[in-house]
Amino acid sequence: MLLKNCETDKQRDIRYACLFKELDVKGNGQVTLDNLISAFEKNDHPLKGNDEAIKMLFTAMDVNKDSVVDLSDFKKYASNAESQIWNGFQRIDLDHDGKIGINEINRYLSDLDNQSICNNELNHELSNEKMNKFSRFFEWAFPKRKANIALRGQASHKKNTDNDRSKKTTDSDLYVTYDQWRDFLLLVPRKQGSRLHTAYSYFYLFNEDVDLSSEGDVTLINDFIRGFGFFIAGGISGVISRTCTAPFDRLKVFLIARTDLSSILLNSKTDLLAKNPNADINKISSPLAKAVKSLYRQGGIKAFYVGNGLNVIKVFPESSIKFGSFEVTKKIMTKLEGCRDTKDLSKFSTYIAGGLAGMAAQFSVYPIDTLKFRVQCAPLDTKLKGNNLLFQTAKDMFREGGLRLFYRGVTVGIVGIFPYAALDLGTFSALKKWYIAKQAKTLNLPQDQVTLSNLVVLPMGAFSGTVGASVVYPINLLRTRLQAQGTYAHPYVYNGFKDVLLKTLEREGYQGLFKGLVPTLAKVCPAVSISYLCYENLKKFMNLE
């Protein structure tokens, strides 16, 4: 059995110094991120060209977080890393002979191969396709392993015939020693608690992803799937979030459309009675309470979910495009700024990316949004329900103004969504980045090893959503009234944005611009929190980050 501590402290220090010298390409005793990238290129390391992996490794090496790694930093990193590597080696080296054969690695990697092999199949013979894939990984990770390949009977090999020469070394002949294992994984970042997992993930992503078709076309299959995954995760998150908060959305639309209801918090009951002399002062209640009673009287609990089916149809592409476009736009901004990773993107560019993503999402689903508001503003005593109400409303809209009516107020909507999405996505990203940096410093860990708990994500989402919704609420209210104009609940008709603004101020004053803000925030806080919570967890589940 191999002993971990077979080398003396002096020998280990000499080895660390030699390794550091290979990374110190400028020979000044300090290694920067650019130096590390150059060293990987110069030494033909398997991860050369993978700036993301090298940056993660550099972050782990930079123990004191001064953006420079010296020999002292490297020794601390290496000592901690080798302890982890040794433990991993022991788990894989089941016969404890101090060597790991390709079959032992195959058994371990089969668990990591996108969970394509179930635990109850591990004892069965692996398919030739998977064996070939793992063998390619073995050769990629340990290109110098041939010094330790057990080539038995070399003398007899020279006497082989031409046919015999075509036979390759068997899998059982391939192995790596602990020293080779350690030297490779020492310069691999650690994700999800395993350096081997990280190495195999990068190999699979950047080497196995390129699939040559019969015509020789190169298609980046997994890269496409990875990018598309952000859209899928965003869409699912939006559907879950919107369904959970549908009643609040119904109340918001009801209050925005009803201009005859005034807040009892901002107005005294005497003032309200002056506007409506026939009202009973003892029965004057808040608009929110009146909305709840009216909706419940209309159809019970189901009344609070009117339009939610349409909401789901709308929110999946909207949320999908918002989150997916945000990730794509951040990558574009990263290239424009010359950053190596989206995590290094400036706050300004992050906010801009969020705003652009919101605009793309809003424009794509605007007709569905308009139809939804029209359905929710139908007469409370209408005999049409469900799909019948939906289809009849759509027919009436098309008959009244054609497709153009479905895009009424789109300019206001696009302009209004930019600051909201920018503040929402940008603030959440900024909070997430700040928290990870703070925790990494407190726990003395690399930032890539800091994970966000669900209890942290929820308040972050609530805060970012509240900030965004509050700032742009007046624009959102005016847009909604433009969309709902001429309906039973909102019979007024406007000539444009300026007209709806002036008439709103004339009828309700400045407080009218914030009517429905309370139920909106009551909806936004949990909605955005749930959305981000689902999105962050789905990204982890789908291995998107």
UniProtKB/Swiss-Prot annotation:
InterPro entries per the UniProt record, alphabetical: EF-hand-dom_pair (IPR011992), EF_Hand_1_Ca_BS (IPR018247), EF_hand_dom (IPR002048), Mit_carrier (IPR002067), Mitochondrial_sb/sol_carrier (IPR018108), Mt_carrier_dom_sf (IPR023395)
EF-hand domain ranges (all copies): 11-46, 80-115, 120-155, 156-191
This protein's GO CC annotations: mitochondrial inner membrane
First and last residues of every Solcar repeat: 225-332, 345-434, 452-541
A Pfam family of this chain: EF-hand_7
Disulfides per UniProt: none
General function of this protein: Calcium-dependent mitochondrial solute carrier.
GO BP terms, alphabetized: transmembrane transport
SUPFAM superfamilies with a match to the protein in the record: EF-hand, Mitochondrial carrier
Domain of life: Eukaryota
Family: Belongs to the mitochondrial carrier (TC 2.A.29) family.
Positions contributing to Ca(2+) 3 binding: 161, 166
GO molecular function list: calcium ion binding
Keywords: Calcium, Membrane, Metal-binding, Mitochondrion, Mitochondrion inner membrane, Repeat, Transmembrane, Transmembrane helix, Transport
Residues binding Ca(2+) 1, per UniProt: 65, 70
Name of the molecule in the record: Calcium-binding mitochondrial carrier SAL1
Membrane spanning residue stretches: 231-248, 307-326, 355-368, 409-428, 458-475, 516-535
Cell location: Mitochondrion inner membrane
Topological type in the membrane: Multi-pass membrane protein
Residues given in the record as Ca(2+) 2 binding sites: 93, 95, 97, 99, 104
